[in-house]
Amino acid sequence: MRTAWVAKRQGQTNVSQMHYARKGVITEEMDYVAKRENLPVELIKDEVARGRMIIPANINHTNLEPMAIGIASKCKVNANIGASPNSSNIDEEVEKLLLSVKYGADTVMDLSTGGGDLDVIRTAIINASPVPIGTVPIYQALESVHGSIENLTPDDFLHIIEKHAQQGVDYMTIHAGLLIEYLPLVKSRITGIVSRGGGIIAKWMLHHHKQNPLYTHFDEIIEIFKKYDVSFSLGDSLRPGCTHDASDDAQLSELKTLGQLTRRAWEHDVQVMVEGPGHVPIDQIEFNVKKQMEECSEAPFYVLGPLVTDIAPGYDHITSAIGAAIAGWHGTAMLCYVTPKEHLGLPNAEDVRNGLIAYKIAAHAADIARHRPGARDRDDELSKARYNFDWNRQFELSLDPERAKEYHDETLPADIYKTAEFCSMCGPKFCPMQTKVDAEMLEELEVFLAKDKEMVSQR
């Protein structure tokens, strides 16, 4: 779809959506996003120019259907997929991608760490994906030196980052905010550093006693991103891994640096979103969102959960969806899904489905709470169908139509029950929605009540 659009930008040194927006140019991607979001295209342009919205759209990902991440747009959901050294292959990863898109993922991150040729896996995912693809290039950098962290050089990082950009990756997690002076701040934590990328950088700095190479070479990464319109997803290496560690000095020190890096990227018209926690008690979620907006000049916030309690392994799609809905309500732009397998193992197809649906619920609830235009229309349509016992319409409007129909049909599978004015919960005699009160009956009641009130007042 975008082949002709990007062809017109050949030969330009900066092809980012922010660069065009700041020049007053409305790109085809901005126009497409405006229609998808039902927002004025001028608003899209202004939000991108300001940095409060990003349109992750690498010029080499031409089959992409452009979308927006920002406080003015609908709350988005990301799904993680990826092969590991112990499982998965190309076909399985493409299947996970298509499953993620089917159940509503707005973006997908390929977090592959093994399981075959990572370049081949990534290229297959990008070629099959209509949604933006994100990666964490440090994983492949580590794989390129066979897991020997101390052997990594800044050039290794830059080489892998450019390769991902050339292949069409739309946004990359760059762990540039973890500075060597922040490492002692994790001593009082229960779970230390829980970011895989952050852990790699921390070990590198501890071995070499040198500053984070992604920080010292940040300007070189900016130059790569300008050429391909790759968006930064600034990684929160010091995100809390349990509720005890939330909002501590380590997390907030890194957040301040992420804000500085955000503005540095903006000086070169490169798009940025900022990643956030993690594990956060309910009473600290609003603070975390507002603090990010303050420190990062309202760049879009992209959070993992957050989980609001640590005691429910096997159910962390629920513990985190609670936090995600609250974070979205307070202004978080994108939610990274968590599956029931979080902390336990690699998710399968059913885990991906359950995680995504939980997060689509959270994002939609946030849109309703923020009074986004049209956010509740689907709810109202489904409620009307429910009241009218239009079962097929209810299934159609559900976030997961297959699951809704499956549960209904467990007890009432025959087609005749698709027009029945009851379900198996109440049966045919006790459903309160059978009590249809029409306008004429209400008018008669109002007349009666008015007369009754008049008689009482005359006594």
From Swiss-Prot:
Supply the name of the protein.
Phosphomethylpyrimidine synthase
Q: What is its EC number?
A: 4.1.99.17
One GO-annotated biological process of the protein: thiamine diphosphate biosynthetic process
| Function comment | Catalyzes the synthesis of the hydroxymethylpyrimidine phosphate (HMP-P) moiety of thiamine from aminoimidazole ribotide (AIR) in a radical S-adenosyl-L-methionine (SAM)-dependent reaction.
Cofactor(s) required, per the database record: [4Fe-4S] cluster
| Residues making up the signal peptide according to the UniProt record | none
Q: Which family does it belong to?
A: Belongs to the ThiC family.
Which reaction is this enzyme known to catalyze?
5-amino-1-(5-phospho-beta-D-ribosyl)imidazole + S-adenosyl-L-methionine = 4-amino-2-methyl-5-(phosphooxymethyl)pyrimidine + CO + 5'-deoxyadenosine + formate + L-methionine + 3 H(+)
Q: Which UniProt keywords apply?
A: 4Fe-4S, Iron, Iron-sulfur, Lyase, Metal-binding, S-adenosyl-L-methionine, Thiamine biosynthesis, Zinc
- Positions that bind [4Fe-4S] cluster: 423, 426, 431
Highest rank taxon of the organism: Bacteria
Q: Name one GO cellular component term.
A: cytosol
Q: What is the lineage of its organism?
A: Bacteria, Bacillati, Cyanobacteriota, Cyanophyceae, Synechococcales
Could you say which residues bind substrate here? 80, 109, 139, 175, 195-197, 236-239, 275, 302
